[in-house]
A protein has these predicted regions:
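Terminal targeting signals and extreme-terminal segments of soluble enzymes
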Residues: 1-131
Length: 131
């Protein structure tokens, strides 16, 4: 699925013009972005702040796919991130997101950011359903 990230002028759209998304299996979704030079830092790799933004924004479409609920709306309660390797600006960046637990109001998520076989970061997050 090709997902346009919000209306023109919003942070989400400015940061990531589009994301690709698909289900890998019943509990796991893959969200892909294509980094550009504007996502880089002074060292010529993907900026850590951009990685954090992608983790946060990529969880939303992943949760919609995994739950099958296109009307799902969540807010981030908590995120824990471990930076493992630098991200290459020339390669697509995938967020592989797994729903580990769902309750009436909460979604418990684990994920990995990857470029091919390289792990860029790992994360866990708690999302609160607001509708």
């Amino acid at each position: 699925m090709d997902w346009v990230v919000g209306p023109e002028g919003q942070f989400n759209r400015h940061t990531f013009a589009r994301m690709l998304s698909r289900l890998d299996d019943a509990a796991t979704a893959r969200i892909r972005i294509f980094p550009g030079e504007h996502h880089g830092n002074f060292n010529g790799v993907i900026h850590g702040g951009m990685i954090l933004a992608f983790i946060d924004m990529g969880v939303y479409p992943a949760c919609m796919l995994i739950t099958g609920n296109e009307d799902l709306n969540t807010v981030t309660v908590d995120v824990h991130t471990q930076f493992i390797n630098s991200g290459d600006l020339a390669k697509p960046l995938d967020s592989v997101v797994t729903l580990t637990q769902e309750t009436g109001r909460m979604l418990f998520i684990r994920g990995t950011l990857r470029q091919d076989e390289t792990v860029v970061a790992t994360f866990s997050t708690l999302q609160r359903k607001i509708r």
